Amino acid sequence: MSIVALLIGLGPLIGWGFFPTVASKFGGKPVHQIIGATVGTLIFAIILAVVTSSGFPTGTNLLFALLSGAGWGFGQIITFKAFELIGSSRAMPVTTAFQLLGASLWGVFALGNWPGIGHKIIGFTALVVILIGARMTVWSERKEASNAKNLRRAVVLLLIGEFGYWLYSAAPQATSIDGLTAFLPQAMGMVIVAVIYGFMNMKSENPFRNKITWLQIISGFFFAFGALTYLISAQPNMNGLATGFILSQTSVVLATLTGIYFLKQHKTSKEMVITIIGLVLILVAASVTVFIK
């Protein structure tokens, strides 16, 4: 692995690692966050399309790319709602675990991954380890009923949001276009969902006139940067799909730690140790699910 490939492979660490923290730092409600983040992603995607002169898909390729982006928009709205309940540092490991489970199960039952009994035993064991790791990251020494209630609500929300993230990753597999070509229509699908959600919230306020909404465009740049560098990293002449995926998953570590330290989402020393162990379990188990394909 060259230095250039490694640096590009760590791009998602920066983009996706800081995205939830930046979005939470700017504040606002989920409606402000999703509109700003998706507009930022769309701006990034338009600039990329112009610079690279990548084509624009048509027909079913366009439809599935739009559905992919719409899925992400739905999933991210739900995730922002979970941030309100338990904070980004607790929500990110859980949603990452659910996304890994969703992608892995789709790969097994729809794409024929993990052939053979041995591979399936190892794979499903790794998925159990991922769930254990996620549970460890949200463990708390404080047993207040309100904390437990918020955690349960957040987990249910994140589980629902996983259907959107699953669509984000699965829909492009039904197309014949590459990631760079799909990037712009995906961003368009994200914005469509965000705008619809914005109009659904018009009774309480006009989110399109709130300055926080447009400040959140910066958070969208972080997400888009992570997505772009992942697409490049996964190319065979760079890190390849397996290594690129594993490097991208390190973003959950940065997202969790920056949430704790930058957003002051406090953890006790014991909680911190258990959280780090949980993150390591998630990363190791995620690596296993990739290499047994």
Swiss-Prot record:
It comes from the Bacteria. GO terms for molecular function: carbohydrate transmembrane transporter activity. Keywords: Cell membrane, Membrane, Sugar transport, Transmembrane, Transmembrane helix, Transport. InterPro entries: Sugar_transport (IPR010651). The chain crosses the membrane at residues 2-24, 34-56, 63-80, 95-117, 122-139, 154-171, 180-202, 212-234, 241-263, 273-292. One of its GO terms (cellular component) is plasma membrane. Its main location: membrane. It is a multi-pass membrane protein. It is found in: Cell membrane. Could be involved in the uptake of ribose. Belongs to the GRP transporter (TC 2.A.7.5) family. This is Putative ribose uptake protein RbsU. The gene is rbsU.
